Amino acid sequence: MTTVRLRENEPFEVALRRFKRTIEKNGLLTDLRAREFYEKPTAERKRKKAAAAKRHYKRIRSQMLPKKLY
Protein backbone atom coordinates (compact mmCIF):
# COMPACT_ATOMS: atom_id res chain seq x y z
CA MET A 1 0.00 0.00 0.00
CA THR A 2 1.33 3.38 -0.96
CA THR A 3 1.25 6.12 1.63
CA VAL A 4 2.31 9.74 1.40
CA ARG A 5 2.51 11.86 4.51
CA LEU A 6 2.01 15.58 4.37
CA ARG A 7 5.16 17.43 5.27
CA GLU A 8 5.09 20.54 7.36
CA ASN A 9 3.64 23.51 5.44
CA GLU A 10 3.25 21.39 2.30
CA PRO A 11 0.28 22.14 0.05
CA PHE A 12 -2.13 19.32 -0.67
CA GLU A 13 -1.51 19.59 -4.43
CA VAL A 14 2.20 18.86 -3.97
CA ALA A 15 1.44 15.83 -1.80
CA LEU A 16 -1.08 14.60 -4.37
CA ARG A 17 1.54 14.96 -7.10
CA ARG A 18 4.02 12.94 -5.02
CA PHE A 19 1.36 10.27 -4.46
CA LYS A 20 0.61 10.04 -8.19
CA ARG A 21 4.33 9.76 -8.95
CA THR A 22 4.82 6.90 -6.48
CA ILE A 23 1.76 5.09 -7.86
CA GLU A 24 3.16 5.47 -11.38
CA LYS A 25 6.60 4.19 -10.34
CA ASN A 26 5.12 1.14 -8.61
CA GLY A 27 3.01 0.32 -11.66
CA LEU A 28 -0.14 -0.03 -9.59
CA LEU A 29 -2.34 1.85 -12.03
CA THR A 30 -1.36 -0.28 -15.03
CA ASP A 31 -1.80 -3.43 -12.95
CA LEU A 32 -5.23 -2.27 -11.81
CA ARG A 33 -6.31 -1.53 -15.38
CA ALA A 34 -5.05 -4.93 -16.53
CA ARG A 35 -7.04 -6.72 -13.82
CA GLU A 36 -10.20 -4.68 -14.29
CA PHE A 37 -11.70 -7.30 -16.61
CA TYR A 38 -11.00 -11.01 -16.90
CA GLU A 39 -8.75 -11.95 -19.77
CA LYS A 40 -8.66 -15.50 -21.05
CA PRO A 41 -5.27 -17.20 -20.75
CA THR A 42 -5.09 -17.64 -24.53
CA ALA A 43 -5.83 -13.94 -25.09
CA GLU A 44 -3.19 -13.01 -22.52
CA ARG A 45 -0.58 -15.21 -24.22
CA LYS A 46 -1.50 -13.75 -27.61
CA ARG A 47 -1.20 -10.18 -26.28
CA LYS A 48 2.16 -10.87 -24.63
CA LYS A 49 3.51 -12.58 -27.75
CA ALA A 50 2.46 -9.61 -29.91
CA ALA A 51 4.12 -7.20 -27.46
CA ALA A 52 7.34 -9.25 -27.53
CA ALA A 53 7.36 -9.21 -31.34
CA LYS A 54 6.79 -5.46 -31.34
CA ARG A 55 9.71 -4.95 -28.92
CA HIS A 56 11.90 -7.21 -31.08
CA TYR A 57 11.18 -5.30 -34.29
CA LYS A 58 11.62 -2.00 -32.50
CA ARG A 59 15.05 -3.10 -31.26
CA ILE A 60 16.04 -4.24 -34.76
CA ARG A 61 14.85 -0.95 -36.27
CA SER A 62 16.90 1.06 -33.78
CA GLN A 63 20.06 -0.93 -34.60
CA MET A 64 19.73 -0.53 -38.37
CA LEU A 65 21.82 2.08 -40.11
CA PRO A 66 19.80 4.93 -41.58
CA LYS A 67 19.26 4.96 -45.34
CA LYS A 68 21.50 7.34 -47.24
CA LEU A 69 19.75 10.44 -48.41
CA TYR A 70 21.01 11.43 -51.86
From Swiss-Prot:
Keyword set includes Ribosomal protein: yes
Pfam family, any one: Ribosomal_S21
One of the protein's GO biological processes: translation
Cellular component, GO annotation: ribonucleoprotein complex; ribosome
PROSITE patterns per UniProt: RIBOSOMAL_S21
A single MF term (Gene Ontology): structural constituent of ribosome
Keywords: Ribonucleoprotein, Ribosomal protein
Family assignment from sequence similarity: Belongs to the bacterial ribosomal protein bS21 family.
Entry-linked NCBIfam families: S21p
Protein name per its UniProtKB record: Small ribosomal subunit protein bS21
Taxonomic source organism: Polynucleobacter asymbioticus (strain DSM 18221 / CIP 109841 / QLW-P1DMWA-1) (Polynucleobacter necessarius subsp. asymbioticus)
